[in-house]
Amino acid sequence: MKQSKLGVLMVNLGTPDAPTPQAVKRYLAEFLSDRRVVDTSPWLWWPLLRGVILPIRSPRVAKLYQSVWMDEGSPLLVYSRRQQKALAERMPEIPVELGMSYGSPNLPDAIDKLLAQGVTKLVVLPLYPQYSCSTSAAVWDAVARILKGYRRLPSISFIRDYAEHPAYISALKQSVENSFVQHGKPDRLVLSFHGIPKRYAQLGDDYPQRCEDTSRALRAEIALPAEQIMMTYQSRFGREPWLTPYTDETLKSLPSQGVKHIQLICPGFSADCLETLEEIKEQNREVFIHAGGEKFEYIPALNDDKGHIDLLEQLVRDHLSC
C-alpha cells in the first residue's frame, strides 16, 4: 500500500495587512460577515455592518493597531509565522503551512501549497486551545468549502481543541511561574478568556466548559490558593449579554476588595495580538490602576516559546499516527 504524504495546516484568526483604516475595514468586513461569528440575519446585519459599524470602527481600530504594530508586521502574524517556522524545523519531513481564516496569508493559498506538494493526509491545527463555534468551527467550515473545489481530496485529521492537554497546561504553568519569579506572587492571578455571546452557549457551544476545564487544570498546578485564581471573559462586542464575569468590570472592582497586585494571563490566545497587547496590557491595566490598584503585570501569550512548540509538535504527531 502506498504511504500517505503528510502535511500540516496551522490556522489562526487573521489580521489586517496594515494598521490603516482601509486595511482594517477590509479585514473587519470579512471577519464580521462570517455567520459563525455573527449569526444575525444578513438582511439585518449587513446594512448595519457596512453602513454604520465599518465606517465608525475602522479608523478607531486602526489607531489601536498602530499602537502595537511591530517592525515585522501585525503581532499575531509575526508570532504565528514564528510558530510555523519552529514547528517546521521540528518536523523537516512534513510540510507545514500557515493560513488565516480572515486576511492574509489566506487558507485557499495554504491548502493549495500543501496539495501541490502531494499531501494526501492533512492535519488541520486551529490555534484555539478551547473549541468555539465562532473560531474552531469556522475553520472547519472554511476548509470544507475550499476543498469542494478539488477533485482529489486528502484525508483530514482535525484537531478540535487542546484545552486540557498536559503539555498545554505545563507551558501555561511555566509562563505563570516565570512571572512569579520576576514580579513576586500577586494578590490575584486572573485568567482572561475571549468572550462569546451567552446565547451561543445556550444553543450548545461548549466553549465556556472548555475554558473552565483549562482553568481547573491550571489551578491544580499553580502555587497559589485556588480562591486567588480568577477566571473572566474579555472583548465583548455588541449589545447582547456575553459570558461573565467581564474582565474590565472585575479589575475595576478588585482594589475596593483590598486587591492591589494582580497578574493576568490570557490562556485562550496562542499568540499575542490586539486583544492582549492593547485591550489587556494597556486598557485593562489602566482600569485596574485608576480604580486604586498598584501593580499590574501582563503575562505574555505562549507565542513561540519552546514549551508551546513542544505542545504543537505533540498534537500533530499524535494525529499523524491516527
Curated annotation (Swiss-Prot):
Q: Which residues bind Fe cation?
A: H194, E275
The protein's name: Ferrochelatase
| UniProt-recorded Gene Ontology molecular function terms | ferrochelatase activity; metal ion binding
Functional description taken from the UniProt entry: Catalyzes the ferrous insertion into protoporphyrin IX.
Catalytic activity, reaction form: heme b + 2 H(+) = protoporphyrin IX + Fe(2+)
Gene source species: Yersinia enterocolitica
* Pathway the protein contributes to: Porphyrin-containing compound metabolism; protoheme biosynthesis; protoheme from protoporphyrin-IX: step 1/1
User: What are the protein's UniProt keywords?
Assistant: Cytoplasm, Heme biosynthesis, Iron, Lyase, Metal-binding, Porphyrin biosynthesis
Q: Which Pfam families match?
A: Ferrochelatase (PF00762)
Q: Which PROSITE patterns match?
A: FERROCHELATASE
Q: What is its EC number?
A: 4.98.1.1
Location comes to: Cytoplasm
List the Gene3D superfamilies hit by this protein, alphabetically.
Answer: 3.40.50.1400
**Where primarily located?**
cytoplasm
User: Matching CDD domains, A to Z?
Assistant: Ferrochelatase_C, Ferrochelatase_N
